[in-house]
Amino acid sequence: MAAQLAGALRPPRIELFFKTPAELKERLRDLTAAGYRSFNLVNKDKKDPMLAWVDVCCEELGPGDDVCAHFSSKYNARGGPALAERLAALAARSQASGVALSTLLVSGSGKRKKGHFASDLAGALNAPPSPVGVAFNPYEDDMEKERAALAAKLKGGGVSSVWLQFGVRLEDLDRELLWLRASFPSLELVGSVFLPTKKLIAQQKFRPWNGVALSDEYLSGPEAAERVTRQLLAVYAKHDVRPLVEAPGVRTAKDLAVVSRLFGEPAPPAKKRRL
């Protein structure tokens, strides 16, 4: 069963967790040595030096690798102009390095300030110089509102991917994926996955994250959480959704072993490329 599921899934993306540029380099070297080629950089603070992190990735990676740099409208107060500048900068770096660079536009957690809505970014999303994705939560109480918000983001035609919030209400997920595939068949879909570890479960029991829909079964322990995670991945495979491995992060060999157990071993990495 596990082998069949791994074979049906697309190779996972890995969200990068680090505190310093040196640690970022170490993560990239360990993960590429293990065969992983696609990564995400998270924007959690207005002081995040995102383009400097992208430069580190471009130094360590090469053609065939790709990096998605998140852009939080909460932490980038100039809205559309700031996003347009980011997209142009990524396009230039991608051309110079051969690394495929893209952006995931998110609103950020907590209450949004005036001007921090996707509609204010419409100009930058109309014809972006580098690929842009937007977020979608298939577990919202008001899905009509969530669908309408997504349709507004996609109206300009410049968005190429939709990124799904993590959760385990699988009937809701299946329903929304059916709608997404019927309504926007050309879009790439990426779905979040949490690693079912003791650390993650303890974290979510103590202080659950806003908008994350987890069940009592999932929170009952690592074995149950892994079982539910495999059911989630089966839904992703059914709808050709690419997984994104998020919390609590792939930081150690033990974390990497959990990823391999869920997804199988990645393709052998090519020899190291230096540009």
Outline where the language-model segments fall.
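Active-site beta->alpha loop and helix N-cap motifs at the rims of alpha/beta catalytic domains
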Residues: 2-148, 156-159, 216-230, 237-242, ...
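Short, hinge-like loop/turn segments at secondary-structure boundaries
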Residues: 86-88, 180-181, 206-210, 262
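Short, conserved beta-strand edge motifs with alternating hydrophobic and charged residues
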Residues: 133-135, 161-165, 189-194
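Short acidic/glycine-rich loop or secondary-structure boundary segments that cap or lie
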Residues: 141-143, 170-175, 197-202
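Glycine-rich beta-alpha junction loops
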Residues: 168, 193-199, 249-251
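C-terminal helical cap(s) of enzyme catalytic domains, especially alpha/beta-barrels
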Residues: 173-180, 252-274
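Catalytic-face loop-and-helix region of soluble metabolic enzyme cores
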Residues: 188-241
